[in-house]
Amino acid sequence: MTSRFRLPAGRTYNVRASELARDRQHTEVVCNILLLDNTVQAFKVNKHDQGQVLLDVVFKHLDLTEQDYFGLQLADDSTDNPRWLDPNKPIRKQLKRGSPYSLNFRVKFFVSDPNKLQEEYTRYQYFLQIKQDILTGRLPCPSNTAALLASFAVQSELGDYDQSENLSGYLSDYSFIPNQPQDFEKEIAKLHQQHIGLSPAEAEFNYLNTARTLELYGVEFHYARDQSNNEIMIGVMSGGILIYKNRVRMNTFPWLKIVKISFKCKQFFIQLRKELHESRETLLGFNMVNYRACKNLWKACVEHHTFFRLDRPLPPQKNFFAHYFTLGSKFRYCGRTEVQSVQYGKEKANKDRVFARSPSKPLARKLMDWEVVSRNSISDDRLETQSLPSRSPPGTPNHRNSTFTQEGTRLRPSSVGHLVDHMVHTSPSEVFVNQRSPSSTQANSIVLESSPSQETPGDGKPPALPPKQSKKNSWNQIHYSHSQQDLESHINETFDIPSSPEKPTPNGGIPHDNLVLIRMKPDENGRFGFNVKGGYDQKMPVIVSRVAPGTPADLCVPRLNEGDQVVLINGRDIAEHTHDQVVLFIKASCERHSGELMLLVRPNAVYDVVEEKLENEPDFQYIPEKAPLDSVHQDDHSLRESMIQLAEGLITGTVLTQFDQLYRKKPGMTMSCAKLPQNISKNRYRDISPYDATRVILKGNEDYINANYINMEIPSSSIINQYIACQGPLPHTCTDFWQMTWEQGSSMVVMLTTQVERGRVKCHQYWPEPTGSSSYGCYQVTCHSEEGNTAYIFRKMTLFNQEKNESRPLTQIQYIAWPDHGVPDDSSDFLDFVCHVRNKRAGKEEPVVVHCSAGIGRTGVLITMETAMCLIECNQPVYPLDIVRTMRDQRAMMIQTPSQYRFVCEAILKVYEEGFVKPLTTSTNK
């Protein structure tokens, strides 16, 4: 049937045109918004309105104060090419298909620190977002961290663990990760029991504090292909632009390095600053799948740079001719920046707001397989970190970090004289204190173990909302290609990266008058339970570097937090005092009449320091070759670039900043066995214990020894260097040491300490004198010879098992040139020592036993150094921070101090530059 028909008078009537005219008069459209609690809410708006109108009605519905962190993502776009609703563009021009339209309410900008979010309700929205991203596979997460995050989520939703109510299988109706295995629930339940006393708000804060350490936290990915037609991913984040290829981060371009980002048609360009040795600036080009994908990536870069790096958005450019014609995109980010958002939240946030949390219905959501979606672009277990500075927080996320709920006394400088009027009391708690080295410069010994404080949970849980319907977005694979043409003259969409104006504080920084008074009394051993670093002599502010759980510093209200800057100690200004003087001031508090320590701190000032150092962060280059290179040349290029990055990082100091931010203990790893009553005496230091998952287990009834397996895999080779990192034997653990050596088949022991340093016993002599023999249980050790020089000693021994009547030759290599305090001034002797170790263990597959006193500091330095040498030989890039992270995933606190880390970084650079170890054409074993 046609739309035209002839009337008797010979006239026509166009039915379709009439219907279109009718539709044009109906301007109201329906937008279905999928919220973060998996509910769908319909909103009616005028299709001619700007996108901001729809955003405003959604924010009003949610009663959301801190709005600038969130946005609406178009649901018809795939997640690998995200497109956000533009607040300054008419809705009808963005939503092309017929009403109703579907959009997803999501977090758009992920803050680096949850303390920047002022309202508990805002943090709850973040919590829902990240929980959803992990469940759907959008945010890959290692299993141990996933279990810890899930336990915080359970604590938030179910409250305290109750053995009578939380029976076996009480988590069977919940899903937290894709393809969740059955034993995963048991691990969650075990961790859930450790969170007794945490309120929902505290559990969610700890959830966010842990989630921000994930590799892909806050990264928005867009897919592309390189010159070999291999898939790469271009990620946009707060710090700059990332390039991933074959699961490996190939490079990072910080905003400081980028001059301009631009696009034309489907070609996206990054223009980099000119290096000193370069004659002109570098222009990188990438071919996207189409114009829309290219512009989406460009807009994401503009928004992230403006939000995180500028104090305020750039004003629109005024041009007389702009009314008549335009060239390029008129898009500019016009919302609040992070600086403005934090300040706005402080002024407008309702911190006493009460709201109802939605119960999880995770099984209603159809899970997505990340591996299938990304076509092996990323793996949650095998993602390799190469060039991006770590975003991990200082230390392990603390289970009782509640600065967001306990508002401290806010003081201005004019009120400092009245500090004595503000009294805060702490609750007593039983604590255990670690041993402290006389060479330590810490204010107090680290206190790690304590009996849990008994806190009364909240009076009641907020009412639960009805079960929600869930929804899943489709993920479509998009293909891109890579271009390196220099098309400077053909670009029609540009965004110049402005130089940051002088500003009093970096983005999100805390104003100088935002001070908090903290009071605490020492425990029965005279310890406060926190460490500080910095001082006038170190040209750094005094920063709290660690707060141990269950200690006075942890239990006081307001709580002392890692990253707080100490301004006054007992009313004394410490701005011009050295580190040692600051330590003495803190110790002297125990001798005061009141015995009380009074600190005036600037909360979380460490983030000011970190962001200020971003101005001097190392530059990274990613310069595609004109023709595909063979793998050997590619590896050599990556190795050279990693050494350039390391050298610049040592000059600017960013390597130490990144090291300070790395977790000391891997989140989720337990050390329960070391704390059993029968094993406590076997630990040389109370705060240095082996992980349960990687500890060496002895045969027999008493199976404990303070030792961990550490395996270091060398990529692109068959090499896996196996170590056993352990503490120096005590008089009553020598038998355990030799039993471990025998059972593990080890034929080499590397010792990195002398027996006594500065009057303190660091290691008991667990071997006999030359030509002598000693028995240790059923093991007899004979020392045949001892020779060496001023730096190291070689001992040839025989280990004899009297029960089995079997013997084994054994070599002990002891390094004796490490100074009593600090690190060696020159690494030459140490590098010679490492080379001897490598030569002695060549061809051996059994683990090498390595120990110093605690088994973490110098032991970590040696393992890092040998691993770096192997990587150089195999033409692989060397990233020391990744090596330390890998070690700490297997034994806590490996490489103990920043000075040790700097020493090994300088030694690695020396090995490369002076040719101690040279790349081989083929990967061979040592």
From Swiss-Prot:
InterPro entries reported in the protein's UniProt record: Band_41_domain (IPR019749), FA (IPR014847), FERM/acyl-CoA-bd_prot_sf (IPR014352), FERM_2 (IPR035963), FERM_central (IPR019748), FERM_CS (IPR019747), FERM_domain (IPR000299), FERM_N (IPR018979)
Occurrences of domain PDZ (ranges): 517-589
Active site: residue positions: 852 (phosphocysteine intermediate)
Molecular function in Gene Ontology: cytoskeletal protein binding; glutamate receptor binding; non-membrane spanning protein tyrosine phosphatase activity; protein tyrosine phosphatase activity
Changes after translation: Highly phosphorylated on serine and threonine residues but not on tyrosines.
Protein family according to the UniProt entry: Belongs to the protein-tyrosine phosphatase family. Non-receptor class subfamily.
Protein name: Tyrosine-protein phosphatase non-receptor type 4
Species classification: Eukaryota, Metazoa, Chordata, Craniata, Vertebrata
